[in-house]
Amino acid sequence: IEKDCNFAIEDEKEMVLIGYLAFLDPPKPSAAEAIEQLYAHGVAVKILSGDNDVVVKAIARQVGIDTSHFLTGIEIENMDETALKEAVKDTTLFSKLTPLQKTQIISLLQEQGNTVGFLGDGINDAGALRQSDIGISVDSAVDIAKESADIILLEKDLMVLEDGVLEGRKTFGNINK
């Protein structure tokens, strides 16, 4: 089959739409329970995504994350540093973010004294994984995400996040004795 990259307006005639193709990336079955347990242990959960706001809000609702505090990448672009510093404190959902905006948000949270873990699996997550205190990826992630992560989850169950928090706190407590 020859590849022909020369297209003209004339080529776009007598076309008939035969359907749409949609992709769904639903949350893992354990996500809602894992998030509930993280909340119970005092861990704040935020979504930083390049996806659109409709998708991000739908996923957040499914896993039990508050959808009332929401910012888009475009809104962030139009904010000054002071306003953004204040906004990231309470915002739980961020959509249509660029890779640089993800990194910026993590950095601002760290400046406020937070220890930030970031879970990502795509090319656009590499910078955020590096910037975070604990970069977490999954075994099926793209290579650059796995290389940028501190931890790679081998299980498909997000409850290991709770286990990690509890073990980390035990270790920290033992070190400080």
Describe every region a protein language model picked out.
Residues 1-123, 130-133, 175:
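Cytosolic catalytic headpiece
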Residues 122-177:
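Mg2+-dependent phosphoryl-transfer enzymes with acidic/Ser/Thr/Gly-rich catalytic loops
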